[in-house]
Amino acid sequence: MKIGFVLPCYNEFENIFILIKQIKKIFNNHLIVIVDDSSTNEIKDKIIKYKKIKYFKRKAKSGRGSAVLFGMKKILQDSKIDLIVEMDTDLSSHPKELPKNIKYFKRKKLDLLVMSRYLKGSKIKNWPLKRRLFSFLSNKLAKFLLRVNVSDYTMGYRIYSRSATKHVINNCGKIGDGFIVLSEILAELNLNKF
C-alpha cells in the first residue's frame, strides 16, 4: 500500500522538517507533496535532499484549501497511491497514530476519516487561547449548518480513499479557498454518500 501525504504549509520552516522526519520514520512506501502557499522563508533548498517528496511553491498566497486541492491533484498523478493523508504542518498533530487509524480506515472500508481534537483523550498542542476559541466556535457553527457525523469539522488531519479524493478535486473549492474548504469537503462527501 502506498500513501500520499498532502502537506499545505505557510511559513513553517522549522516544523516542516520535523514532520517529514516523523513521517519517514513510520512509513516506507509513500509520497509527500508539500504545497508552500508563498512562504516568506525559503525551504526548497533543504527539501531537495529528501527522496519521495515533491515541493511546489505558489507565487501568491491562495489559501489552505486551494493548497490541499492542488496537492491532491499532484498525488493522484501517481496511480499506485491508495490512500491520501492530509496533515497540517504546524505540528498540532503527530503521524504516530496513523498506522492504527489506517488499519481502522481499511477495516471499516471508509472513504474519509477525520481525526479529532475534541474526542476523549485528544489534546490540542501549541495553540494560543484565541486559536482554540476560534476552532471551538467554528466547529459549533459547522455542526449546526452541515450536520455531518464528525466531531471536528475544521481538523486538517484526514485520511481519504482514492475515489473520495478524485471526487473532492472535481467538486470542491467552489465556495472559497481557505479553511472553509475543510467544511466544504465534508458536506460534499456526505451529500454524495462517501
Give the residues covered by each predicted segment.
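Catalytic donor-sugar/metal-binding loop of nucleotide-sugar-dependent glycosyltransferases
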Residues: 174, 186-194
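Short, well-formed alpha-helical segments that are part of the catalytic scaffolds
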Residues: 11-25
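Short beta-strand-to-loop acidic/aromatic patch adjacent to the donor-nucleotide binding site
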Residues: 80-90
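Cell-envelope/extracellular polymer assembly enzymes that use nucleotide-activated donors
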Residues: 2-4, 31, 184
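Donor nucleotide-sugar binding loop of glycosyltransferases
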Residues: 12-15, 39, 94
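Acceptor/aglycone-binding surface of glycosyltransferases and processive sugar-polymer synthases
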Residues: 54-74, 95-179
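A conserved acidic beta->alpha catalytic loop
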Residues: 36-44, 91
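Short beta-strand/loop segment that forms part of the nucleotide-sugar
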Residues: 30-39, 58
